[in-house]
Amino acid sequence: MGMKFFNPVTPSSRGTVLVSKVGLSKDEPEKSLTSGKKSSGGRNNHGRITTRHRGGGHKKKYRVIDFKRNRSGQGIVEKIEYDPNRSGFLALISYKEDDIKSYILAPQGMKPGDVVTAGNDADILPGNCLLLKHIPVGSFVHNVELKPGNGAAIARAAGCYAQIVGRDGQYVLLRLRSGQIRLILSSCKATIGVVSNPDHKNRKLGKAGRSRWLGIRPTVRGVAMNPVDHPHGGGEGKTSGGRHPVTPWGVATKGKKTRKRNKSSDKYIKQLKG
């Protein structure tokens, strides 16, 4: 889609860079594939904050996305849409055989009129869904299942992909964007291609208000707090915190390993990140 730059006619537009939405549909989302979505504001069922910096934002309708791709037959791409709930774009697919529509994550390069299909005999083309055992080594895939039939769990954000780098018995070796090489059952499904909107990472919101529209609240530095609120808080005048950077709960940040030792999925990881 490309990027959209703004002339600095106001302080907030100076330096603002957004993703261009040229080519996206301006229609309302498919009503049969939407549902209400209530914002939690980062609170749990007790009303306590479990995720900081969440709250407010524009109202959103949730788009029901087909992450399992169990429907066989050819589908026609009707339009590419913006989804406020995720960074990638959506494609509305129409199946003429049974007059059913569904949303899928749009891969890069997909456009209205394209044909997609799911099944073991599908061609190796963006948007087609196959079992990993039927996809050639070296292919880029997204929407990858971790367990057969559970639906896609890996490589779903804008610009994300995984690469098939080899096979090992009933498993496929998959290199993730982090550099990690992981064993995935070859009976899991994956979709060919790279998720759309790779320029999402290059956007600059330009003003605090645009973050608030997205439901993101301000982040306060620990050194600006009181001692009761943060390990870096307090002190006379401006201080540097007086210790190595930690979270509000005293856990070292800046590179500390957070993965649990002896995790059951360790046996499926062939190479760590990097």
UniProtKB/Swiss-Prot annotation:
Species: Wolbachia sp. subsp. Drosophila simulans (strain wRi)
User: What spans are recorded as compositionally biased (Basic and acidic residues)?
Assistant: 263-274
Read off the HAMAP family from this record. Ribosomal_uL2_B
| One of the GO biological process terms | cytoplasmic translation
Can you cite an annotated GO cellular component? large ribosomal subunit
Q: Disulfide connectivity?
A: none
Lineage of the organism: Bacteria, Pseudomonadati, Pseudomonadota, Alphaproteobacteria, Rickettsiales
Record bears the keyword Cell membrane:
no
Note the Gene3D superfamilies from the entry.
Answer: 2.30.30.30, Nucleic acid-binding proteins, Ribosomal protein L2, domain 3
The keyword tRNA processing appears for this protein: no
Q: Which UniProt keywords apply?
A: Ribonucleoprotein, Ribosomal protein, RNA-binding, rRNA-binding
Provide the assembly information: Part of the 50S ribosomal subunit. Forms a bridge to the 30S subunit in the 70S ribosome.
* A GO term for molecular function: structural constituent of ribosome
Pfam families, A to Z: Ribosomal_L2 (PF00181), Ribosomal_L2_C (PF03947)
Q: Where is the composition biased (Basic residues)?
A: 45-59
Q: Where is this region: Disordered?
A: 21-59, 223-274
- Superkingdom in the source lineage: Bacteria
Give residue spans, biased composition: Low complexity. 32-42
> NCBIfam families per the record?
rplB_bact
Protein name per the record: Large ribosomal subunit protein uL2
Q: What function does this protein fulfil?
A: One of the primary rRNA binding proteins. Required for association of the 30S and 50S subunits to form the 70S ribosome, for tRNA binding and peptide bond formation. It has been suggested to have peptidyltransferase activity; this is somewhat controversial. Makes several contacts with the 16S rRNA in the 70S ribosome.
Q: Of which family is this protein a member? A: Belongs to the universal ribosomal protein uL2 family.
